[in-house]
Amino acid sequence: MVALNIYGQQLDSRLLIGSALYPSPHVMKQAILASGSQVVTLSLKRQNPAEKAGQQIWRYLQEVVTEVNGHLLPNTAGCKTAKEAVTLAKMSREIFQTDWIKLEVIGDDYNLQPDPIELLHATEQLINDGFKVLPYCTDDLVLCQRLYDLGCQVIMPWASPIGTGKGLMNPYNLETIRLRLPNATLILDAGIGKPSDACLAMEMGYDGVLLNSAVALADNPVLMAKAFGQALQAGEQGYVAGIMDQRQTAHPSTPTLDTPFWHQN
């Protein structure tokens, strides 16, 4: 299969995985390894040097990223304005030594929907400052087009609100974005609940999936991480193989013409 391209970096896995909500740092590490992911998201807040737990998580993250030859993807979770997001992105670049940033600017506290106006403002500022921006957005076609026009090579529309596990609420919107932005790297982000959701996204032609809660909150996070890795592979292979068109009428898979009891109506 073709490698996932994120701003010139070739990755074997199309799964991006978060580092929050796990029962323990050890489970987090084992789940990330089981997933096969080479990109791990994290927030600056989780790396508080004054907290021993934060130090332990940071050590595990460094170990796993080194082991899989992967990349850290800092995010701007919790930011509500472009100014806040830009400030946090610059801090993250200095601390984590990466110009990748998962840009989140939340506009509503209830469903954690991104603020499109502030998101566009922050994107423009960060790109002008040399960042490689991976914006988290809704499944709004025009917003995705504007982000692409600003210079985002990677765009991350949601499947459904963060942490809901509702899966792909708007398949039509997501398919339209894929059709209208054929050259963008599209990664489905947020709302994924089960491996079949991720598989469906790949069957649509999406380039990857980013998730966290679906693995971290599973009864067995390590096994669920492995299941998601396999689901993405299955979906990608199905898309590349070419999925049959749906039909309005039934067609027998076994030809009945000239069989002993063939009937013609």
Curated annotation (Swiss-Prot):
SUPFAM superfamilies in alphabetical order: ThiG-like
Pathway(s) the chain acts in: Cofactor biosynthesis; thiamine diphosphate biosynthesis
Subcellular location, record wording: Cytoplasm
Statement: the UniProt record of this protein carries the keyword Chaperone: no
GO cellular component, one term: cytoplasm
Active site (record annotation): K102
Reactions catalysed: [ThiS sulfur-carrier protein]-C-terminal-Gly-aminoethanethioate + 2-iminoacetate + 1-deoxy-D-xylulose 5-phosphate = [ThiS sulfur-carrier protein]-C-terminal Gly-Gly + 2-[(2R,5Z)-2-carboxy-4-methylthiazol-5(2H)-ylidene]ethyl phosphate + 2 H2O + H(+)
First-listed, main subcellular location of the protein, grouped into a coarse class: cytoplasm
GO terms for biological process, alphabetical: thiamine diphosphate biosynthetic process
Residues involved in 1-deoxy-D-xylulose 5-phosphate binding: G163, A190, G191, N212, S213
Subunit structure: Homotetramer. Forms heterodimers with either ThiH or ThiS.
Function recorded in the entry: Catalyzes the rearrangement of 1-deoxy-D-xylulose 5-phosphate (DXP) to produce the thiazole phosphate moiety of thiamine. Sulfur is provided by the thiocarboxylate moiety of the carrier protein ThiS. In vitro, sulfur can be provided by H(2)S.
Family in the record: Belongs to the ThiG family.
Record-linked PANTHER family: THIAZOLE SYNTHASE
Protein name: Thiazole synthase
Lineage of source species: Bacteria, Pseudomonadati, Pseudomonadota, Gammaproteobacteria, Alteromonadales
Protein encoded by which gene: thiG
